[in-house]
């Protein structure tokens, strides 16, 4: 089975690392960066869209995407999916910084995520995978809307949303789902 795996907040702790970088760079004090309650959280941190994008570009160029360990369970989930014979494709909408692909490849290699392919695109539905895991509610809806099976990685910013999405606790949760006899399912996720 071909599995599309998002990076940020599925493998890599984007929110936590960005919070650390913002605090260290003096962009915002720690107290001004609460845990997000929704996916698009720039305004929760008091930043406008343009300012948010500019700081994220700077953070990426400063090495944000090449440092820091993966999320708990990500490596174990990856290993379990590999051991079950699945092909793993990193499919991310990362666009921050001057070299997002190189930064992503560097970080993946450093932590042993041996992807079969890497795709940087916001049109994830165009990547030929049997199932996707992502933390973005909009991305899950896009994938399902194009008839793709999509499983949402449970996070604080998507937990409260209504919907009958398949929900797992990160990549380890996806590995459990797919190795529990569900790996041959071909129907798209229920909408």
List PLM regions with ranges.
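Substrate-recognition "cap/lid" segment bordering the active-site pocket of phosphatases
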Residues: 91-145
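Structural recognition of alpha->loop->beta junctions
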Residues: 105-121, 163-188
């Amino acid at each position: 089975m071909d599995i599309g795996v998002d990076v940020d907040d599925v493998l890599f702790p984007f929110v936590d690392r960005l919070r650390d970088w913002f605090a260290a760079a003096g962009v915002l004090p720690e107290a001004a960066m609460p845990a997000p309650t929704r996916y698009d959280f720039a305004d929760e941190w008091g930043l406008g869209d343009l300012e948010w994008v500019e700081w994220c570009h700077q953070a990426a160029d400063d090495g944000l995407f090449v440092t820091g360990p993966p999320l708990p369970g990500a490596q174990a989930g990856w290993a379990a999916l590999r051991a079950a014979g699945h092909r793993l494709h990193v499919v991310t909408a990362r666009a921050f910084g001057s070299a997002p692909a190189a930064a992503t490849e560097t970080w993946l290699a450093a932590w042993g995520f041996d992807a079969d392919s890497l795709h940087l695109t916001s049109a994830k539905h165009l990547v030929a995978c049997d199932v996707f895991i992502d933390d973005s509610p909009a991305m899950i809806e896009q994938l399902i809307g194009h008839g793709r099976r999509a499983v949402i990685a449970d996070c604080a910013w998507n937990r409260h949303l209504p919907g009958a999405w398949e929900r797992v606790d990160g990549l380890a949760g996806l590995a459990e789902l797919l190795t529990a006899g569900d790996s041959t399912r071909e129907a798209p996720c229920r909408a």
